[in-house]
Amino acid sequence: MKEVLPLVVLCLATYHTHSIKIGISHNYNATISPTASTTTEAPATTGAPSSETVSSISTLPEAEVTTTTPAITFPPRVQQKPKVAVASPTMSTALPLNSTEVNSTLSVSGDNTFYYCSCDLQAGRCDLNCCCDNDCPLETRQVFNCLPNSLLPQLESRLEDFQYTHGLPTCQINDGWLCVFRSNTKATKTQPPDMNIDTSQYRKWKDNLEYQESDYAQSRPSAGHYKFGQTLQLWQPETKQLATLELPAAYESPNCQLKQSVWHLQPIRHVCRMKDSAQLQESIWSLLNQTSNYEILSKPRDLEEPEVNGLIVQVCLRGANKSMRCLERGNDTQLDVIVDHVELQLIHNFTNILEAKLFLEEAKLAEDDNEPLWLRYNVEFVTLNESLTKPTSGPLGYLSGAPVILSRMLPQNSSEDKQLISYHSLNQNIKEFHWLSLPSRKPRGSSCQRALDHKEALRFGIDLLTRCELRHAAPLLQAHANHTEYCQGLQAQIWSLLLPHNCTQLEDVTKVFVSHLGRPQPDKWLPMEVRYPENVHEMPPPVQAVYDEMRQSLSCRNIFLSVGYEFHVAHLAMVEGRAPHQRVLQHARLVLGQRHDLEFDTSEIEVALPLSISAMFYRMQTKALSNGAAVGIAGHLVLVEMIYLGIIYLGSMQLCL
């Protein structure tokens, strides 16, 4: 039995918090009977699952490859391709939902194998100015300023030319003992220079002397819809006056002294500093007078149309308790509350504005009158089916800084033959958070908090380390109390902060899957592996409660206070090379920290436990590249040493001669 290490006393300085002893858990012998004053309570459950449960989602066996390799000669010469017998391809990293029955457990959607659009970042939703997006209707091409089809360099442009751009010549030019031999590349084709260069698509300086069309021709739309970036128009039905929708803006100053027009499909976020509450109230009244007297045109006005129909802006007030109260037309200018946040929400179908709503959020005034007041303006463009879309983190692979996508296995009914991931479920009643939300520290304190918001989710490629405290009520130290229930509840509350969302025990992690791609596909999900470093073949021992009647103390054994997430990243070329350098996840792992023993006494009213959580992203090629670079450097050093010794030897021969 290992020697018991001394307990580490962590003093948590709070007004109700007292000292708590945290020690390292050890393997206790269950056959040794405790003393008369000590009571050990076994958990009510049957214990942690065996290693068979974790290994049920395992890697598929790789395909057997039989290859005949000819003799290697230097310099290499053109040889016939060896005959390769390859079995049916399988995925050893991105696993199906059940490795034992692949064909019967996968739910395959439509064939999108050869579809790739570099600007299509959201599945089931049309992306702005992305004309190759399958989710965009044909009418949007008349509205968008189309982005290029691919923002990444093509594979052809990444072939390096060893003839002129490197120090080593090719063997075609200088066939020596040190040259580059490229036998598998196609012969370079020299094209005659094109003398007729079209520069119409390039950016140019604007010619101020060029003839400009009249205001009538510019204001008259060609197709009866807004273009991307076109100014939204207001209409006064009584005076038949046309105006533009403008909001206060600031330039090189926190005070908003300018006006900025609202452009179609372009969100706006402005923050303006106010002198006092009177100026704040005056700004709100000015905006409400504009929205009550004017209507927003759903499309630019056509001078040939006799009647103009505008959209009435609906004004709603958000209270401090997130309550919503919409005001009637005519009474929306009489507000006695102080507002510090204005949000204009425009619902559209890309070509026209369908509905307009103005949300006013009540301000929380500070006790200090000298604290400055700020007024925030937000303009959001929302599509009709935006809430029904699934989250994505890239056109195919992950974008750097995009949220890591998670999902879980749905419970399988007896009538269903296929087991589905909740991300691909068509049931709209299932509301699930598809990101890995990690706890953070409160701004004013060290307590842990967790918000189900994509802004707080783990970002791809960004390592993270968070330390915070969990505050929990002290146990009731009585001889006949259920101490095991308290210790298990304490560990469950810790797991609710350290594990993915809706996971209160380690068994729930086996149902969590991580998307292999930034644009999830039904058969490209990775299981979240649970790794216990003390014994990689078994799960950790269950939580135990030991009550010492003589000392009036309770010990919760085998408590975990820290975890670490590990993700292995690879860069692959997909879609037959048309989507190069895609960042994908190859492996996801949850590594458990060290087990601890927590000891509580009667002097404690509230306990504060230190928690730690980390997330690391590893490139799978980094280790191989670093080792290869070391070998290459060593080889170069040996070569340089041989050349150096050869020069010395030749020099000595010359001296002797």
Swiss-Prot record:
Highest taxon listed in the record's lineage: Eukaryota
* Spans through the membrane: 630-650
List all topological domains (Cytoplasmic): 651-657
Which residues lie within the region annotated Disordered?
Answer: 35-57
Keywords from UniProt, A to Z, are:
Cell projection, Cilium biogenesis/degradation, Cytoplasm, Cytoskeleton, Glycoprotein, Membrane, Signal, Transmembrane, Transmembrane helix
Signal peptide extent: 1-19
Where is the sequence biased in composition, kind Low complexity?
A: 35-51
Its membrane topology is listed as: Single-pass type I membrane protein
Q: What is its subcellular localisation?
A: Membrane; Cytoplasm, Cytoskeleton, Cilium basal body; Cytoplasm, Cytoskeleton, Microtubule organizing center, Centrosome, Centriole
Cited function: Probable component of the tectonic-like complex (also named MKS complex), a complex localized at the transition zone of primary cilia. Has a role in ciliary structure and function.
Family, per the entry?
A: Belongs to the tectonic family.
Quaternary structure per UniProt? Probable component of the tectonic-like complex (also named MKS complex), composed of B9d1, B9d2, Cc2d2a, Mks1 and tctn.
**PANTHER family recorded:** TECTONIC (PTHR14611:SF2), TECTONIC FAMILY MEMBER (PTHR14611)
Q: What is this protein called in UniProt? A: Tectonic
Query: In which organism is this protein found?
Result: Drosophila melanogaster (Fruit fly)
> What gene makes this protein?
tctn
